[in-house]
C-alpha cells in the first residue's frame, strides 16, 4: 500500500498570469504557498483485478477507458497501470475552494502510482525522482490532455 500526502496551496498574487493564454505571449509570475491542509491518495492492489476508485464518487470498472474520473484515468494510462488497482482519495478540504485541489490530486496520484509501480516491479527506481518532472507531467495531463482551464 502506498500513501501520498500532497499539500494544498493558496495564491497571493499573479493569478491568471499562469494561464497558457497569458504566459505563451508574455511573462507570468505567481506567488503561492503550501498550507497545512492536504490531499491523501492511497494506492493498493485490488482484490479482483479491476480498477476501484473511491473519491467523492465511487467507481469500479473492468476497462480503464470506462473510468469516468478523467484525471485518474489519464494518470493510470500515463504510468502504464491498466488494471488491478484500488485508489482512495481523501481531502482535508473539499474541491472547488480555489486551493488547487485538482492539481494537488494529480501530483499526489502520479507520485503514488509511480511508487506503486516500482514496488510491483520490485524496482529500486521511482519514476519521479525529480519534482520538476512530476510537476511537468501533472501539467501535461491536466492542461494538454484534458484541456483543463488551470494555470501552470
Model-derived features: where do they sit?
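Alpha/beta catalytic cores of group-transfer enzymes, especially the acyltransferase/condensing modules
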Residues: 128-152
